[in-house]
Amino acid sequence: MIALSQEAVRSKDTINHYVLSWREGEQPSPEQVEEAVSIFMDELGVKDHQAIYGLHADTDNLHLHLAINRVHPETLKVVKINNGFDIEAAHKAIARIENAQGWQREQNGRYQVLENGELGREHIDKDKPRQPAQPKRDMENRTGEKSAERIAIEDGAPIIKKAQTWEQLHRELAAKGMRYEKTGSGATLFVGDVGVKASSADRDASLSKLQKRLGAYQPPQRQQVAQREPEPIKPDVPGWKDYITGRKAHYSEKNADKLVQDKRQEQERKQLAEQQKARRDELMRGNWKGKGEVLNAMRSVIAAEQAAEKAALKEKHQKQREQHRQQFRPYPDLEQWQRMQKSPELAEQWRHRASEPQRIEGDRSEPPTPRDIRAYQPEIVGQQVHYSRKEEGGRGGGVSFVDKGKSID
């Protein structure tokens, strides 16, 4: 594949990499994997091209890495997949794979296969509530905390849309811990100290549209902005307040320590620079008339010594920064934290909050009795038995399922 790729001397990178991921619990057979690759490559128009793929099971979701060589093996021409819009073609391929193999559709899939076998664009519901950008939703999933963008959408946008004057807009936003400020040619809606692009909250919240409706922008007049507390994305999550308090304390301490370290290191760099300059100045104050060769030799010696001093200081600072990173490791996400608190059931509830988790229901309850289940390590916890997948050395990993007597979650 590499040799063929190098034949395309005018194209630097002719190998595209894609990742196809199945939902947790979905187990494609080898035949289905082969079929999925064929459908995917056919939809992208590269069915005759070279490809390498492999199925990985190192995460909770089985996923397939697929590398496709865009150089045609016979014509040696470089194919521009879907005129450069290969991701759009990939969305179509996913819809066809889901339809052919019966997998659950992606929540935000762009396409679906119609009854006549043709692809149809998923209907966009204009009345559907606006959602934060994907990175913000990812952070919400990790921490359980509403992002500033979501708060701007849910709390800020309604206030902005109903405001009749700039004074009313600033006053009502301030009561909710927000402020609307002109920034450059646009505007930013601040939720606490976190800025959100105003148009991300609502199309009608942009500066241009508000100025058409309310007149020229008027800044707030000494407005007292209320203090906002962190808000959970889902109400009544057990332990969430303790989790988010610990998380914020962790990063507050980390940032404070980093500021002290940066200030100290900057002072050390400045001090070394001053010392080295003083030494060079002292050298030049001597009488070097007629001793040019000696002066140049001394300059070389001092330059080498000072370069070594700078390198030593740089290495020292790098070690300090690494110690800082080790001391303040990333705080666990909410699910990990719940498992660390010996609450696997709560962790599973959070993990599957958007769907009904798989479970087995019986017709009677039994006392907690460890069962010999291959590859799993049982542990009695109260009136339950927690089963963890065995790792190397016989140790148990994270809890996989819980036997509650009458039901298994």
From Swiss-Prot:
Record-linked InterPro entries: Endonuclease_MobA/VirD2, TraI/MobA_relaxases, TraI_M
Keyword tags: Plasmid
Biased composition (Basic and acidic residues): 118-149, 262-284, 309-325, 348-374
Top-level lineage group: Bacteria
Stretches the record annotates as Disordered: 117-149, 215-239, 262-285, 309-409
NCBIfam families named among the record's database cross-references: TraI_MobP_relax
Name this protein carries in UniProt: Protein MobA
Species of the source: Acidithiobacillus ferrooxidans
Lineage: Bacteria, Pseudomonadati, Pseudomonadota, Acidithiobacillia, Acidithiobacillales
